[in-house]
């Protein structure tokens, strides 16, 4: 199949509630949307690059430049028999995994629609529902954090993750344990600490956490291995895992006991499946992370989460936590038992509301005919 046209949009949506990590606080979310048109079909992808280069060196602007100038023209020149061919075709472009993933994942959606099957089935998924966890950002006070967690637990979420940073860590976790007891709980540092903080981080061992996510710098697998030897709590790597090779190296080094998979971070579905399979081979569980995606990207995440080694609840939550209205119909919803139904229609299995997309669009580029 050849792609007739690629549409790229910069869109911005207001968040229902501000979201704060160790990188800072945001009140809205700019991101890129990809729409592929081919043979009377359309398909969608979402680029998870942020406006700022804090989580990743990629930004919405770098992704726009790379997609319009390099990746998009290359994709238009391909005759694609299967979407697994797309990521290798981008090899000449170094890095820029988030830009690559937006196009690659849209190609998977397109192929699933052409085959008349769900994206999850095409990816090799085995589930009809996935377990949903929730990520709670840094709040203005411990009471605000407690109120936020109470709301999420009442909504049925099966696991709570709280963001931490120096000055907002041990006492925040202590409060959660004192008020909510033995709920499934983990923390995410977003690389806010150094190995010199090992003794401080070891204080978290007392709280029976599922894991501590990405405590150290994004490019420091060796120090994560040293830290893991000093902690009882499992380390989960996020920002560090930007390829299947790095995942294998991290496992071999003992740098983590859990891995968070985000397709945007590794370049799309094909490398995500490779990371998933490497982890399964070594008995390392995985879960699906989130990047405050719209319903388009969120639905992609749901489908990938159906693969068998996604054994832990991921950061794939209801649309209403983030965007009202969302860009899809029906929006992503969480059942009272904390699970999300996997869409069964062709491709991502939900309808994209083009009118809402157009209202949110700040910039549009079109490649091809």
Pin down the residues of each PLM region:
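Flexible C-terminal active-site loop/helix
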Residues: 1-15, 26, 31, 292-369
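Conserved, mostly hydrophobic/aromatic
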Residues: 3, 34, 40, 71, ...
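Short Gly/Pro-enriched turn/cap motifs at secondary-structure boundaries
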Residues: 22-27, 154
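Metal- or metallocofactor-binding catalytic centers and their adjacent structured scaffolds
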Residues: 36-37, 41-114
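Hydrophobic faces of well-ordered beta-strands that scaffold small-molecule active sites
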Residues: 45, 132-136, 160-162, 185-189, ...
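Shared catalytic-loop signature of beta/alpha-barrel
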Residues: 71, 208, 219-236, 241-339
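Glycine-rich, aromatic-flanked loop segments that form ligand/cofactor-binding clefts
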Residues: 94, 105-136
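Metal-dependent enolase-superfamily TIM-barrel catalytic cores that perform enediolate-based chemistry
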Residues: 121-231
């Amino acid at each position: 199949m050849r792609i007739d046209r690629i549409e790229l949009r910069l869109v911005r949506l207001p968040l229902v509630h501000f979201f704060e990590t160790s990188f800072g606080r945001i009140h809205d979310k700019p991101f890129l949307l990809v729409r592929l048109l081919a043979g009377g079909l359309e398909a969608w992808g979402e680029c998870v690059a942020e406006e700022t280069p804090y989580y990743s060196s990629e930004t919405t602007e770098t992704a726009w430049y790379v997609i319009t100038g390099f990746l998009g023209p290359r994709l238009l020149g391909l005759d694609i028999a299967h979407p697994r061919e797309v990521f290798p075709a981008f090899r000449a472009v170094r890095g820029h995994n988030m830009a690559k993933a937006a196009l690659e994942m849209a190609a998977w959606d397109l192929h699933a629609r052409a085959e008349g099957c769900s994206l999850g089935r095409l990816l090799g998924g085995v589930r009809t529902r996935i377990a949903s966890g929730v990520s709670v950002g840094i709040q203005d006070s411990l009471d605000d954090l407690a109120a936020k967690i109470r709301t999420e637990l009442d909504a049925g979420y099966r696991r709570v993750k709280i963001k931490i940073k120096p000055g907002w860590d041990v006492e925040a976790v202590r409060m959660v344990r004192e008020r909510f007891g033995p709920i499934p709980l983990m923390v995410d540092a977003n690389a806010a600490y150094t190995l010199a903080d090992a003794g401080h981080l070891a204080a978290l061992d007392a709280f029976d956490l599922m894991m501590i996510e990405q405590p150290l710098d994004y490019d420091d697998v060796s120090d994560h291995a040293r830290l893991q030897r000093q902690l009882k709590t499992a380390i989960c790597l996020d920002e560090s895992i930007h390829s299947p090779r790095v995942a294998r190296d991290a496992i071999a080094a003992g740098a983590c006991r859990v891995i968070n998979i985000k397709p945007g971070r590794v370049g799309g579905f094909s490398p995500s499946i490779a990371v998933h399979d490497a982890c399964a081979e070594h008995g390392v569980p995985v879960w699906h992370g989130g990047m405050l995606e719209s319903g388009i990207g969120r639905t992609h995440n749901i489908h990938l989460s159906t693969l068998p080694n996604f054994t832990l609840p991921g950061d794939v939550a209801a649309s209403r936590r983030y965007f009202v209205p969302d860009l899809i119909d029906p929006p992503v919803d969480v059942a009272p038992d904390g699970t999300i139904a996997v869409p069964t229609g062709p491709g991502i299995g939900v309808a994209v509301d083009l009118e809402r997309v157009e209202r949110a669009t700040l910039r549009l580029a079109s490649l091809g005919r």
